[in-house]
Protein backbone atom coordinates (compact mmCIF):
# COMPACT_ATOMS: atom_id res chain seq x y z
CA UNK A 1 0.00 0.00 0.00
CA UNK A 2 1.18 3.49 -0.92
CA UNK A 3 0.50 6.13 1.73
CA UNK A 4 -0.08 9.54 0.12
CA UNK A 5 0.14 12.66 2.25
CA UNK A 6 -2.06 15.18 0.45
CA UNK A 7 -0.91 18.77 0.89
CA UNK A 8 -4.23 20.17 -0.37
CA UNK A 9 -3.15 20.26 -4.00
CA UNK A 10 -5.32 19.56 -7.04
CA UNK A 11 -2.43 17.65 -8.65
CA UNK A 12 -2.43 15.07 -5.85
CA UNK A 13 -5.29 13.14 -7.40
CA UNK A 14 -3.61 13.08 -10.80
CA UNK A 15 -0.72 11.33 -9.06
CA UNK A 16 -3.14 9.01 -7.25
CA UNK A 17 -4.81 8.14 -10.57
CA UNK A 18 -1.44 7.39 -12.20
CA UNK A 19 -0.44 5.15 -9.30
CA UNK A 20 -3.80 3.38 -9.62
CA UNK A 21 -3.15 2.79 -13.32
CA UNK A 22 0.16 1.23 -12.28
CA UNK A 23 -1.69 -1.26 -10.06
CA UNK A 24 -1.04 0.47 -6.74
CA UNK A 25 -3.80 1.11 -4.20
CA UNK A 26 -3.03 4.51 -2.69
CA UNK A 27 -4.32 5.38 0.76
CA UNK A 28 -4.72 9.17 0.86
CA UNK A 29 -4.74 11.41 3.93
CA UNK A 30 -4.76 15.20 4.08
CA UNK A 31 -1.75 16.61 5.91
CA UNK A 32 -3.95 17.58 8.87
CA UNK A 33 -6.02 14.38 9.03
CA UNK A 34 -3.47 11.77 10.16
CA UNK A 35 -0.85 11.53 12.86
CA UNK A 36 2.54 9.92 12.53
CA UNK A 37 1.40 7.19 14.90
CA UNK A 38 -1.65 6.45 12.74
CA UNK A 39 0.52 6.38 9.62
CA UNK A 40 3.01 3.99 11.21
CA UNK A 41 0.11 1.72 12.26
CA UNK A 42 -0.97 1.52 8.59
CA UNK A 43 2.45 0.02 7.82
CA UNK A 44 2.54 1.24 4.20
CA UNK A 45 4.96 -0.26 1.68
CA UNK A 46 6.03 3.23 0.60
CA UNK A 47 5.13 6.89 1.13
CA UNK A 48 4.61 9.87 -1.17
CA UNK A 49 4.51 13.49 0.02
CA UNK A 50 2.40 15.44 -2.48
CA UNK A 51 2.67 18.86 -4.05
CA UNK A 52 0.96 21.76 -2.30
CA UNK A 53 0.49 25.53 -2.26
CA UNK A 54 2.68 26.38 0.71
CA UNK A 55 6.15 25.92 2.20
CA UNK A 56 7.42 22.84 4.06
CA UNK A 57 6.84 24.58 7.42
CA UNK A 58 3.15 24.99 6.53
CA UNK A 59 2.66 21.46 5.17
CA UNK A 60 1.05 19.82 8.20
CA UNK A 61 2.61 16.46 9.06
CA UNK A 62 4.80 16.29 5.93
CA UNK A 63 8.12 16.95 7.71
CA UNK A 64 7.14 14.61 10.56
CA UNK A 65 6.27 11.87 8.04
CA UNK A 66 9.69 12.20 6.44
CA UNK A 67 11.25 11.89 9.90
CA UNK A 68 9.16 8.80 10.65
CA UNK A 69 9.59 6.94 7.36
CA UNK A 70 12.98 7.95 5.91
CA UNK A 71 15.17 4.87 6.02
CA UNK A 72 12.24 2.60 6.85
CA UNK A 73 10.14 2.79 3.67
CA UNK A 74 10.83 4.15 0.17
CA UNK A 75 9.76 7.78 0.11
CA UNK A 76 9.02 10.10 -2.83
CA UNK A 77 8.40 13.83 -2.60
CA UNK A 78 6.83 15.76 -5.48
CA UNK A 79 7.21 19.56 -5.66
CA UNK A 80 6.39 20.63 -2.06
CA UNK A 81 7.24 17.06 -1.00
CA UNK A 82 10.64 17.44 -2.70
CA UNK A 83 11.20 20.75 -0.91
CA UNK A 84 10.18 19.13 2.38
CA UNK A 85 12.77 16.39 1.89
CA UNK A 86 15.43 18.98 1.14
CA UNK A 87 14.54 21.00 4.23
CA UNK A 88 14.19 18.00 6.55
CA UNK A 89 17.72 16.83 5.77
CA UNK A 90 19.23 20.31 6.26
CA UNK A 91 18.77 22.21 3.00
CA UNK A 92 17.21 25.63 2.68
CA UNK A 93 14.05 26.29 0.69
CA UNK A 94 14.14 29.71 -0.97
CA UNK A 95 12.06 31.78 -3.35
CA UNK A 96 12.98 30.91 -6.93
CA UNK A 97 14.47 33.63 -9.10
CA UNK A 98 11.89 32.78 -11.77
CA UNK A 99 8.34 31.73 -10.96
CA UNK A 100 7.50 28.58 -12.90
CA UNK A 101 3.77 27.95 -12.98
CA UNK A 102 2.65 25.77 -15.86
CA UNK A 103 5.95 26.13 -17.67
CA UNK A 104 8.22 23.44 -19.07
CA UNK A 105 11.99 23.13 -18.92
CA UNK A 106 14.49 20.62 -20.24
CA UNK A 107 15.86 18.64 -17.32
CA UNK A 108 19.05 16.60 -17.37
CA UNK A 109 19.26 13.64 -15.02
CA UNK A 110 21.61 10.82 -13.99
CA UNK A 111 19.47 8.04 -15.53
CA UNK A 112 19.43 6.10 -12.26
CA UNK A 113 16.77 5.11 -9.72
CA UNK A 114 13.53 6.98 -10.44
CA UNK A 115 15.00 8.46 -13.64
CA UNK A 116 16.12 5.12 -15.07
CA UNK A 117 15.19 4.75 -18.73
CA UNK A 118 13.72 8.24 -19.13
CA UNK A 119 14.59 10.55 -22.03
CA UNK A 120 17.65 12.65 -21.23
CA UNK A 121 17.15 15.51 -21.27
CA UNK A 122 13.46 15.22 -20.56
CA UNK A 123 10.83 17.93 -20.65
CA UNK A 124 9.50 18.62 -17.15
CA UNK A 125 6.43 20.62 -16.22
CA UNK A 126 6.97 23.00 -13.34
CA UNK A 127 4.51 24.67 -10.96
CA UNK A 128 6.53 26.31 -8.20
CA UNK A 129 7.83 29.55 -6.77
CA UNK A 130 10.11 27.92 -4.17
CA UNK A 131 13.04 25.54 -4.60
CA UNK A 132 15.81 23.84 -2.65
CA UNK A 133 18.84 26.12 -2.68
CA UNK A 134 21.76 24.33 -4.29
CA UNK A 135 24.42 25.94 -2.06
CA UNK A 136 22.60 24.70 1.06
CA UNK A 137 22.29 21.07 -0.02
CA UNK A 138 23.63 18.86 2.80
CA UNK A 139 26.23 16.17 2.15
CA UNK A 140 23.66 13.39 2.64
CA UNK A 141 21.66 14.53 -0.42
CA UNK A 142 22.75 14.53 -4.04
CA UNK A 143 21.38 16.24 -7.11
CA UNK A 144 19.88 13.71 -9.52
CA UNK A 145 18.31 16.14 -12.00
CA UNK A 146 18.70 19.81 -12.85
CA UNK A 147 17.85 22.50 -15.35
CA UNK A 148 20.41 24.11 -17.62
CA UNK A 149 20.41 27.01 -15.12
CA UNK A 150 21.46 24.62 -12.32
CA UNK A 151 18.12 24.58 -10.50
CA UNK A 152 17.64 21.32 -8.60
CA UNK A 153 14.85 19.30 -10.20
CA UNK A 154 15.65 15.97 -8.54
CA UNK A 155 17.44 14.86 -5.43
CA UNK A 156 18.16 11.62 -3.62
CA UNK A 157 19.50 10.63 -0.25
CA UNK A 158 22.89 8.99 -0.61
CA UNK A 159 22.13 6.15 1.83
CA UNK A 160 18.34 5.96 2.24
CA UNK A 161 15.53 5.17 -0.24
CA UNK A 162 14.41 8.80 -0.43
CA UNK A 163 13.86 10.73 -3.68
CA UNK A 164 12.36 14.06 -4.62
CA UNK A 165 11.37 15.80 -7.84
CA UNK A 166 10.64 19.51 -8.04
CA UNK A 167 8.62 19.12 -11.23
CA UNK A 168 5.29 17.38 -11.81
CA UNK A 169 5.65 13.91 -13.38
CA UNK A 170 1.86 13.61 -13.54
CA UNK A 171 1.48 16.61 -15.86
CA UNK A 172 0.49 15.79 -19.43
CA UNK A 173 3.14 18.29 -20.61
CA UNK A 174 5.95 16.38 -18.86
CA UNK A 175 7.92 14.43 -21.46
CA UNK A 176 5.85 16.26 -24.11
CA UNK A 177 2.93 13.95 -23.33
CA UNK A 178 5.12 10.87 -23.57
CA UNK A 179 5.42 8.09 -20.99
CA UNK A 180 8.26 9.68 -18.98
CA UNK A 181 6.20 10.91 -16.03
CA UNK A 182 4.40 7.59 -15.65
CA UNK A 183 7.72 5.75 -16.01
CA UNK A 184 9.23 7.82 -13.18
CA UNK A 185 6.35 6.83 -10.89
CA UNK A 186 6.61 3.19 -11.96
CA UNK A 187 10.35 3.28 -11.23
CA UNK A 188 9.57 4.50 -7.71
CA UNK A 189 7.21 1.57 -7.16
CA UNK A 190 9.99 -0.84 -8.15
CA UNK A 191 12.62 0.59 -5.79
Write out the residue ranges for each language-model feature.
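A generic structural motif
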Residues: 23-27
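Amide-donor transfer/coupling interface in amidating biosynthetic enzymes
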Residues: 2-4, 11, 28, 33-44, ...
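Catalytic nucleophile loop
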Residues: 82
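Short, charged N-terminal beta->alpha structural module
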Residues: 2-22
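Local cysteine-cluster metal-coordination motifs and their immediate loop/turn environment
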Residues: 85
